[in-house]
């Protein structure tokens, strides 16, 4: 939880943020950052998957983290009900029940790899699903 003072009428603001990593090589720190989570749901769009999402999958696999990835298709991903619906529906993927790793169909962490639209959509989905 972060908390900060502000000059607005609310005076104090809070956000349920566990941490933030801004550094060179931040992708390589993902296993340490997500040490408390075992089922990672990675969400990216086509562009951000090519830029970093594929590497994130490799890092999670090397760290022994169970994960699955949703790549939102299309030239432009919009922050709308369709995008949110895809994220939430895939989080509950019934096919995951047959995963040989006994991956529960519900992840315990949503990892957004991407742009403002991907991040904002994942933030709302995680709120709706009560996931970090």
Question: Residues of each region from the PLM?
Answer:
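ATP/NTP phosphate-donor binding region
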Residues: 1-109
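A short, small-residue-rich loop immediately preceding and capping a beta-strand
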Residues: 94-132
């Amino acid at each position: 939880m972060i908390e900060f003072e502000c000059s607005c009428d609310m005076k104090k603001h809070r956000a349920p943020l566990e941490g933030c990593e801004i550094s060179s090589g931040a992708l390589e720190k993902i296993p340490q950052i997500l040490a408390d989570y075992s089922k990672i749901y990675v969400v990216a769009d086509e562009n951000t998957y090519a830029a970093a999402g594929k590497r994130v999958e490799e890092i999670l696999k090397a760290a022994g983290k169970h994960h699955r990835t949703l790549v939102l298709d299309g030239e432009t991903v919009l922050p709308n009900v369709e995008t949110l619906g895809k994220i939430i529906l895939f989080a509950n993927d019934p096919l995951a029940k047959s995963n040989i790793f006994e991956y529960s169909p519900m992840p315990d962490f949503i990892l957004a790899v991407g742009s403002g639209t991907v991040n904002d959509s994942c933030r709302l989905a995680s709120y709706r699903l009560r996931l970090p």
